[in-house]
Amino acid sequence: MKRTIILMLDSFGIGAADDADKFGDVGSDTFGHIAQMCAEGKANNGREGELKLPNLSRLGLAHAAKEATGAFAPGFGDNVDIIGAYGHCQELSSGKDTPSGHWEMAGVPVLFEWGYFSEHQNSFPKELTDKILERAGLTEFLGNCHASGTTILEELGEEHMKTGKPIFYTSADSVFQIACHEESFGLENLYRLCEIAREELEPYNIGRVIARPFVGTGPSDFARTGNRRDYAVEPPSKTVLDKLKQAGGEVVSVGKISDIYAHCGITKKVKASGLEDLFDATLEQIKQAGDNTIVFTNFVDFDSHYGHRRDVSGYAKALEYFDARLPELMALLEEGDLLLLTADHGCDPTWQGTDHTREFVPVLAYGAGLEAGSLGKRGSFADIGQSIASYFGLAAMEYGESFMPAR
């Protein structure tokens, strides 16, 4: 039996990457700073005390972070029996965004520059928004700026509901985001608008259009829903997911994975939102998975709910919940299965601003004949994709070095 379970802890970086200076992120450390705030009693909203991640620690998380930063995170140390192989990965890709991290992890680094909307106000070219509005049968829109997704709802959500004008906004990432009320504007209308925007953005080389539906009656109860959709461009070449699919294997997407890969290389898509539902869905898909299958889950809440919102307590509580459920998942593993835990970038909740941070990401690997211990510093996220290709006996990827035992 050959099955790979990939758990993507979206935004869970473990220390500033070697090139963090190019991004203004020197000193960032998502894991380390969360652990520090917990140890100092500054992350006690809904939880309390030091950050407790015993199962991730046994897989090698704290040791991987020590190798990345030079020191154990506060509250973590050598007093643990390591059962997994662990390392830290440097990103080759030009950006610190979600598609770049995911694609590189699957063997296809993004070596070109994405397009960006760098102006914080009046962010979008008029000729672009005019075309989108005309095709959608609309006349005006709101936003046109860099913004936090929750803040912009507080500021413009009511006006959107009164006028029917969609909210267009962006960030430091290569994204064009559209927020609309599910009921007053309509979910299908939002999706159609995003499809139009995706087509019109082709010349601008923007990585993703994101549909951001929300509900509620006013700023006090506006809330984004689980009906988000990402409209990504296709990866520039075949990922390891494509290769397994072409070889007759199965690739199960749980959560937003399928959207991130523009549905390429995916054989089954399972919708789930929220940490609990995503974990439940992952367990169910592992139970159903046969030979030559990848079950791939993105746990987006770490990023969207806690990283971008700079919510240290929330991030810590979510990590502890995730950690507490890992034994359930590991109990489902069969002999020969490969479990991989990693991240796509950082999003340090103690950092200035609301954007991602350029960090090393962990690679925690368990099973499939791997010996417990250090995998060292990995030169690319693509080492993960190359290792998956090696595990399944697929043709080698162009990028990355496998850390799997010799066949």
Curated annotation (Swiss-Prot):
Mn(2+) 1 binds at residues 10, 344-345. Its main location: cytoplasm. Keywords: Cytoplasm, Isomerase, Manganese, Metal-binding. Its cofactor is Mn(2+). The keyword Transferase does not apply. InterPro entries: Alkaline_phosphatase_core_sf (IPR017850), DeoB (IPR010045), Metalloenzyme (IPR006124), Phosphopentomutase_DeoB_cap_sf (IPR024052). It catalyses: 2-deoxy-alpha-D-ribose 1-phosphate = 2-deoxy-D-ribose 5-phosphate; alpha-D-ribose 1-phosphate = D-ribose 5-phosphate. It is found in: Cytoplasm. Pathway: Carbohydrate degradation; 2-deoxy-D-ribose 1-phosphate degradation; D-glyceraldehyde 3-phosphate and acetaldehyde from 2-deoxy-alpha-D-ribose 1-phosphate: step 1/2. The keyword Cytoplasm applies. SUPFAM superfamilies: Alkaline phosphatase-like, DeoB insert domain-like. GO terms for molecular function: magnesium ion binding; manganese ion binding; phosphopentomutase activity. Binds 2 manganese ions. GO terms for cellular component: cytosol. Its EC number is 5.4.2.7. Mn(2+) 2 binds at residues 303, 308, 356. GO terms for biological process: 2-deoxyribose 1-phosphate catabolic process; 5-phosphoribose 1-diphosphate biosynthetic process; metabolic compound salvage; nucleotide metabolic process. Gene3D superfamilies: Alkaline Phosphatase, subunit A, Phosphopentomutase. It is an enzyme of class 5 (isomerase). Belongs to the phosphopentomutase family. HAMAP family: Phosphopentomut (MF_00740). Isomerase that catalyzes the conversion of deoxy-ribose 1-phosphate (dRib-1-P) and ribose 1-phosphate (Rib-1-P) to deoxy-ribose 5-phosphate (dRib-5-P) and ribose 5-phosphate (Rib-5-P), respectively. This is Phosphopentomutase. It comes from Shewanella amazonensis (strain ATCC BAA-1098 / SB2B). The gene is deoB.
